[in-house]
Swiss-Prot record:
This is Cytochrome b. One of its GO terms (molecular function) is metal ion binding. Heme b b566 binds at H89, H188. It comes from Naja nivea (Cape cobra). Signal peptide: none annotated. It is a multi-pass membrane protein. PROSITE patterns: CYTB_CTER, CYTB_NTER. Binds 2 heme b groups non-covalently. It is found in: Mitochondrion inner membrane. Heme b b562 binds at H75, H174. Component of the ubiquinol-cytochrome c reductase complex (complex III or cytochrome b-c1 complex) that is part of the mitochondrial respiratory chain. The b-c1 complex mediates electron transfer from ubiquinol to cytochrome c. Contributes to the generation of a proton gradient across the mitochondrial membrane that is then used for ATP synthesis. Its main location: mitochondrion.
Length: 372
């Protein structure tokens, strides 16, 4: 009887003994989701989805509701930590070749898209100046769709401009989407446990498995505690660290901010959108910046699953990480030289990773065969 079968017999979840800290971000994401759902529920009790009252209701929550400022800041800061964790989680998947478990990877990509939609709708709700203008710019991209664009935009807005029906439906969507995220997360976890977790070596773990509890459960608890400590440190000492100063002013359709930008976690996609001077081209590039992740399971050519023993692929991977950070930085700057050139160059390098990875896989296979 194998180690795995013995563990399953006693109802102990068998997990590879050598999975590293990078495998802890899934449980940290679950912690973030729980925090977001609880704080979001209490905020929804006091929030008013009306263009004349939304901004005032957020001020009322932070000033008058007991512990309202904690709920509001926890909700905003843990949204940022949610995206930090999910980007690390995706990067881990790319590095260790976890995308070869197709069902898990594709359900994870669907989760990412749903999460991004939820965060976008939530950013609009406080009805600050940047909320309003970010919503105007992003929803306006729908008009780039041939034939259907204008109809879709009018349908989403609930009129011919962003108005009261828009904020009502955005609130409804922001409320319902987390429950869809919970459902998708359950599917994601079920699909993962269908095959089991991979490990840093990219080899089969069946011969060397240990019970999830206590070994990995305590490791998960340690990382979740570290994240919550960081969350409360930001909450206590710099609660507005990740907020945009423009959002402290009420939305005014007659005054355009000097530089319209979404929250930091969307800046990489916004930077790619902004680097293309054509509306339809920019919109397609924005969609592809996330959707290109779905191509990874189908373009893997290397005989080795993980990048751990592939130095050339490692260089390419860390170039992608540096590119991601650079696009985020340039997108937070005004549209002027040298930021335009940097943004366009880094956008090309970003997509270059997904095109070059399969070619490099073939090259590495040839090199391995030559060495043998």
């Amino acid at each position: 009887m194998s180690n795995q079968h013995a563990l399953l017999m006693f109802n102990l979840l068998p997990v590879g003994s050598n999975i590293s800290t990078w495998w802890n971000f899934g449980s940290m994401l679950l912690t973030c989701l729980m925090l977001q759902t609880i704080t979001g529920f209490f905020l929804a009790l006091h929030y008013t989805a009306n263009i004349n009252l939304a901004f005032s209701s957020v001020i009322h929550i932070t000033r008058d509701v007991p512990y309202g400022w904690i709920m509001q800041n926890l909700h905003a800061i843990s949204a940022s930590l949610f995206f930090v964790c999910i980007y690390i989680h995706i990067a881990r998947g790319l590095y260790y070749g976890l995308y070869l478990n197709k069902e898990v990877w594709l359900s994870g990509t669907a989760l990412l898209i749903t999460l991004m939609a939820t965060a976008f709708f939530g950013y609009v709700l406080p009805w600050g100046q940047m909320s309003f203008w970010a919503a105007t710019v992003i929803t306006n991209l729908l008009t780039a769709i041939p034939y259907l664009g204008t109809t879709l935009t009018t349908w989403l807005w609930g009129g011919f401009s962003i108005n009261d029906p828009t904020i009502t439906r955005f609130f409804a969507l922001h409320f319902i989407l987390p429950f869809i995220i919970i459902s998708l997360s359950s599917i994601h976890i079920i699909l993962l446990h269908n095959e089991g977790s991979n490990n840093p070596l990219g080899t089969n773990s069946d011969i060397d498995k240990i019970p999830f509890h206590p070994y990995h459960s305590y490791k998960d608890m340690l990382m979740a505690t570290t994240m919550i400590t960081l969350l409360f440190l930001i909450l206590s000492f710099a609660p507005n660290l990740l907020n945009d100063p423009e959002n402290f002013s009420k939305a005014n359709p007659l005054v355009t901010p000097q530089h319209i930008k979404p929250e930091w976690y969307f800046l990489f996609a916004y930077g790619i959108l902004r680097s293309i001077p054509n509306k339809l081209g920019g919109t397609l590039a924005l969609i592809m910046s996330v959707m290109i992740l779905t191509t990874m399971p189908f373009t893997h050519t290397s005989h080795t699953r993980s990048m751990m023993f592939r130095p050339l692929s490692q260089i390419l991977f860390w170039t992608l990480i540096a590119t991601f950070i650079t696009i985020t930085w340039t997108a937070s700057k005004p549209v002027e030289p040298p930021f335009i050139t940097i943004s366009q160059t880094t956008s090309i390098i970003y997509f270059f990773f997904f095109i070059t990875t399969p070619l490099l896989g073939w090259a590495e296979n040839k090199m391995m065969m030559m060495n043998n």
